[in-house]
Amino acid sequence: MNLDDFSDLIERPDGGLRRDAEERRERLSVPPGALGRLDELAEWLSAAQASVPVTAIRQPRVVLFAGDHGVAALNVSARPAGSAHLLVRAVLEGESPVAVLARRAGVPVRIVDAGLDCDPELLPTEVVRHRVRRGSGRIDVEDALTIEEAEQAVRLGMAIADEEADSGTDLVVLGDLSVGGTTPAAALIAALCGTDASVVTGRGGAGIDDLAWMRKCAAIRDSLRRARPVLGDQLELLATVGGADLAATTGFLLQSAVRRMPVILDGVVSTACALVGQRAAFRAPDWWLAGQVSGEPAQAKALDRMAIDPLLDHGVVVGEGTGALLALPLVQAAAALGAELPERPEPEPESEAAAEAAAAAENAGIEDVT
C-alpha cells in the first residue's frame, strides 16, 4: 500500500458551487457579513455537499478510534498504561463528557477498537471485532506496528469510512480514546513539521506534572530520531512512531475525503493523523474542520501547517471527541441558516410610462430651482 495513491483519488469540494453559494449569500435577507464565520461554514458545506442551497445536516455521527500505546509505560500520561478500555467503558455507559453531549444532541457514537491492550471479553463484540493488535509498541525504542499491521489498520479506517458513507452519515465528529496517544501524535507532527520535541510536547487531556512532561519530551525526542529516516513513506512513518488507532484514523480521514464526507477533527491525535493525510494527499484537508483549540502545542503547529482555523476556543482539553462535538451545533446552525433564510425579493422593474413620469418630474424640479 502506498498512501500517496490517495492524491489521485481525492478532489477538492466543488469550487464553482462554492462561488454559487457565495453569490446566493449576497441575496439573502440578512446583510452580507452579519453572520460572520457561519457564512463561510455554510458555503464550505454547500461545496462539500455539491448542493446550492446547502442541505441541513441530518445524520451526523461520532466516531472514536481506541487504542493503548506502549510509551505510556514511561509514565508520560496521567492515566495508567493499558487503561484505555476504561475510557471506552465510560463512553458506553454514558458517563463521559462526549457521551453526555452526544446523548443531549441525539448523535450516535461509534467506538472502534484498533489497538486496546485488554482482554476482548471486557467490551462488546461490536467494539473489539476490528482490533489490529493488542496495544502498540513503545515508539522511543521500537516500532509501534509492523508494516503489515500498519496497512491493516489503515484499511480498517478506510472500511469504517465506507460503512459510514454508505449508511448515510453526512458529517463525522472524529475523536480518540487512548492512553499515551498524545505522545506519538506529537512525534508525528514534529517529524512532519521539522521541529524539536520541546516545541510540540504538551500535557495531554488529563494533565501531567513537570517531571512527566520531561519524560514525555524525552520520549518524543527519541522517537523523532527513529521517525526522520522514514519521512518519505507515510505508511512506514505510522508503523514506526504511530500506532494502530492513529493509522486507522489516518485511513478513515483519507477515505472520508474520497467519499466526500466532511469531518470535524477533535484534538491533537486526530489532527496528527490529518497532517499525515495531508502529506499523502494535499487536497484532503479541504474536507476537514477543526472543532476546537485543544491546548496542545502540537495541534496548533499542525493546524497552522494545514491552514485550518479551529471553530472554538473554550479551554476544553478533555479530548475524546468532546471539543469536536461542541462545534457540531455551530456547523448545524450554519447549514440551517444557509438553507432556510429567504432571499431578498427582486425589485419590480418600472414600467416605461412610470419611468418617463419620474424623469419628467425630476426635470421639472430642476427647472424650478433654476
Task: Mark where each language-model region is.
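N-terminal loops that bind phosphate or other acidic moieties
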Residues: 1-370
